[in-house]
Amino acid sequence: MNPVLFLAAALAGGVGAVLRYLVDLGVARLAGRRFPWGILLVNLSGSFVLGVVTTALPDAAFLLGAGLLGGYTTFSTAMLDTVALWRDGERPASVFNAVGMLLLGLLAAGLGLAVGALL
C-alpha cells in the first residue's frame, strides 16, 4: 500500500472520530442522554455514506471508507450503550439499540449502495 495513502487514511480516521464526537454531543444536547440517539445517527449516516462511496467513488473507498468513516462510525460504543441501557433497566431501549441499529444500518447501507449506483 502507498504510504501516503495509508497516512491520509489514518488522518481521515482522526477527523472521523472528531466528527462522531461532535455529532453525538450535538444530538445529546437536543435529545438528552436517556437514549444514544447521536451514536445511532452516526452509525446510520456512516452506513449510508459508505454505501454511496463504495459504488460511486470506488477509488476513494479506502480513504473515505476505512479512514474517515472508519473513525466516524462505532460498533463498540453502540454495544456499550446497549449494555448500559440494559443495566439501567431500559430493556426495550436496549433491544431497540442493538436490533434496530443492525436492521436500520442494513437498510441505510442498501440505500447508500442504490444511491451510489445512480450517481
Predicted regions and their residues:
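Membrane-interface helix-loop junctions in multi-pass transporters/channels
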Residues: M1-L119
